[in-house]
Swiss-Prot record:
This is Probable pectin methyltransferase QUA2. GO terms for molecular function: methyltransferase activity. Residues 108-684 are lumenal. It comes from Arabidopsis thaliana (Mouse-ear cress). Pathway: Glycan metabolism; pectin biosynthesis. The gene is QUA2.
């Protein structure tokens, strides 16, 4: 019976005899000794395996059964190869690190800028690709033209759904506040009313608007009660605000009265340090319209109204306005924003909520600023009115307001200029000063705070101590230091915007949309100075566009919007004597449809795409722009070439005319000039 072969190191058969066993054991010892010796050789001569073939031939060739007797076996060569690779990798890493270190310390300032620039381009590409993923996820609907909204939404404003808020249990005025839920996003295009007409140009449009452009009934016109509302008259298809009527004289007399109560001649409010006024419940803007001739800029805010809206009519006249309610939330303005707050029968019950509403207007009022209140409550004729008046009077005193004057139904208070007033009050009198954690300079619709804000700000400067308008718009070195800026920065920004505005204005022509587009030349007529009136700057930065338009004597006012996604320059913009607001562009803007003649976005797309968390798509932003834009209104987008191209592709869904134009001063940026068509709804 044959036994199975057993192979050892030499591969020989193991015999059953004892002699063979002893021989085998002796051979094993010899082989182990030889193996140990070979390993030692391997360590001393690690590259010896490269010459294993020559060595084996030198020592007598192959072993039994075809297995080599070479001391450098296959396993040894494998181990040595791995060792060699490890050493090589270590050397490569060391050389790479040394080279990188040498390159880092030897790189010049210009090359560092070049590398940073390339890094930014790679970062922008990555973010753009991520945005693309979100757009592609829309599937076949990505390039589909949006449908038009139904007729019921002609004047719809997202986030202000009073009936829905009432159903959710909001009451006591809270139902008028702003609530942006998941259903706030609008996915259709607003059509103008059937009889809509392009507004008359400024200044004619200040006094005459088309009745069909706004939602108001004849009864609402007749029943208008306050001074500023009584100026309105219905004439055929027009609503007239007669500047030469007796009612206009009444507004002028009212303005003179306030000036006298403050202690200035006529209504030269600039002399008292007043440039910007927040007009709460502004009627239809006649107070602000009158003050424009005095270089006073008035921002109107009022609750959302489904019909007869004060904000809608004021904007239609070409005057600054926005929907704003502070029943439960703080206004989207920084602390210390306005020189004066005005309330002419504005419908706010200042004695409610234990004075919380008065605390909010104190927050946005600058030191030394004025609060003007005209109401029957100030001249009480019964116990209830007396009780409510006494509360407001005493509360105003407790927050360090001084009662300057009272005539008829009008009262004027002046805010303290000294923060020590708050610490000198008796214990328990008035609300306390906000702690550092609660004193947010620029809140964004935060709940109302029962504490006095702004006292820690470096911007606590009395209005009398500020530079008078119009010099205020060009801040000096000391003023700019409050915002961490140097005069050279603002000066360079101003020069760039002067050039940019000249270029923008020349491009607002149908010539660029022709079959053979060209830049309008010197021989082409320039667009008139009053071609635009209401301008929205979606990323205002320092307010440079606003300043350049005024310097170029264009008849515009600008709503300067500072996105919540970027640096907050809104305090500086307001301190320059402009108006503006904080806003998140992934949410609807608080205004009515068909508000603006021009919407401008400088590097807004770059700002939005750089956010780590995307809450909206590009089409969402452009759909909102379409809602805000008047028929035949213009859009100017300035951004990187890649993002401008994505924007151009997106707006095909909006049915706009569009043209991409190169920027002469920058090879990496492009302009996208668009115009919204005047598409009419078919009459039913």
């Amino acid at each position: 019976m044959s036994m199975p072969l057993q192979r050892g190191i030499s591969g020989v058969r193991v015999s059953d005899s004892s002699d063979d066993l002893r021989d085998s054991q002796m051979k094993d010892k010899t082989e182990r000794a030889r193996s140990t010796e070979n390993n030692n050789l391997t360590l001393r001569f690690p590259f010896g395996f490269l010459f294993s073939n020559q060595s084996s031939s030198k020592h007598g060739g192959g072993g039994e059964n075809g297995f080599s007797a070479d001391p450098y076996s296959a396993r040894s060569r494998h181990r040595l190869m791995l060792l060699f690779l490890k050493i090589s990798l270590v050397l490569i890493v060391v050389i790479a690190l040394a080279g990188s270190f040498w390159w880092t310390i030897s790189i010049s300032t210009s090359s560092r800028g070049h590398v940073y620039h390339n890094y930014r381009r790679l970062q922008e590409q990555l973010v753009s690709d991520l945005w693309d993923i979100g757009e592609i996820s829309l599937g076949p609907n990505r390039w589909k033209e949006l449908e038009y909204c139904n007729i019921e939404s002609e004047n719809f404003v997202p986030c202000f759904n009073v009936s829905e808020n009432l159903a959710l249990g909001y009451s006591n005025g809270d139902e008028n506040d702003r609530f942006c839920g998941p259903g706030s996003k609008q996915e259709c295009l607003e059509l103008p009313p059937v009889k809509y007409r392009v507004p008359l140009r400024w200044p004619t449009g200040k006094d005459i608007i088309w009745h069909s452009n706004v939602k108001i009934t004849a009864q609402e016109v007749v029943s208008s009660g306050s001074i500023t509302k009584r100026m309105m008259m219905m004439e055929d298809d027009q609503i007239s605000f007669r500047s030469a009527s007796p009612m206009s004289d009444e507004v002028e007399d009212y303005s003179h009265q306030i000036a006298e109560m403050i202690g200035i001649k006529k209504d030269n409010f600039i002399e008292a340090g007043v440039r910007t006024i927040l007009d709460i419940g502004c009627g239809y803007g006649s107070f602000g319209a009158h003050l424009l001739s005095k270089q006073i800029l008035t921002m109107c805010i009022a609750n959302y109204e489904a019909s007869g809206s004060q904000v809608q009519l004021t904007l239609e006249r070409g005057l600054p306005a926005m929907i704003g309610s502070f029943i439960s939330k703080q206004l989207p303005y920084p602390s210390l924003s306005f020189d004066m707050l005005h309330c002419l029968r504005c419908g706010i019950d200042w004695d409610q909520k234990d004075g919380l509403l008065l605390v909010e207007i104190d927050r946005v009022l600058k030191p030394g600023g004025y609060f003007v209140w005209t109401s029957p409550l100030t001249n009480p004729r019964n116990k209830d009115h007396l009780k409510r008046w006494n509360f407001v009077h005493d509360f105003a005193e407790s927050i360090c307001w001084t009662l300057l004057n009272q005539q008829d139904e009008t009262v004027v208070w002046k805010k303290t200029i000294n923060t020590k007033c708050y610490s000198s009050r008796k214990p328990g009198v008035g609300p306390s000063v906000c702690t550092k954690g609660h004193d947010v300079e620029s809140p964004y619709y935060r709940p109302l705070q029962m504490c006095i804000g702004g006292t820690r700000s470096r911007r606590w400067i009395p209005i009398e101590g500020r530079t008078r308008w119009p010099s205020r718009s060009n801040m000096n070195k000391t003023e700019l230091s409050l915002y961490g800026l140097h005069p050279e920065v603002l000066g360079e920004d101003a020069e760039n915007w002067k050039i940019t505005v000249r270029e923008y204005w020349s491009l607002l022509s149908p010539l660029i949309f022709s079959d053979h587009p060209k830049r309008p030349g010197d021989e082409d007529p320039s667009p008139p100075y009053n071609m635009l009136r209401n301008v929205l700057d979606m990323n205002a930065q320092f307010g440079g566009l606003n300043s350049a338009l005024l310097e170029a004597r264009k008849s515009v006012w600008v709503m300067n919007v500072v996105p919540t996604a970027g640096p907050n320059h809104l305090p500086m913009i307001l301190d320059r004597g402009f108006v503006g607001v904080l806003h998140n562009w992934c949410e609807p803007f608080p205004t009515y449809p068909r508000t603006y003649d021009l919407v401008h976005a400088d590097n807004l797309l770059s700002l939005q795409t750089s956010q780590p968390r995307k809450t909206c798509l590009l089409i969402d932003i452009f759909t909102e722009i379409d809602r805000l834009l008047r028929p035949e209104g213009w859009v100017i987008i300035r951004d990187t070439a890649q993002l401008v191209e994505k924007a151009r592709e997106t707006i095909t869904q909006l049915k706009w005319e569009a043209r991409v134009i190169e920027v002469e001063s920058s090879s990496e940026q492009r302009l996208l000039i668009c115009q919204k068509p005047f598409t009419k709804r078919q009459s039913i």
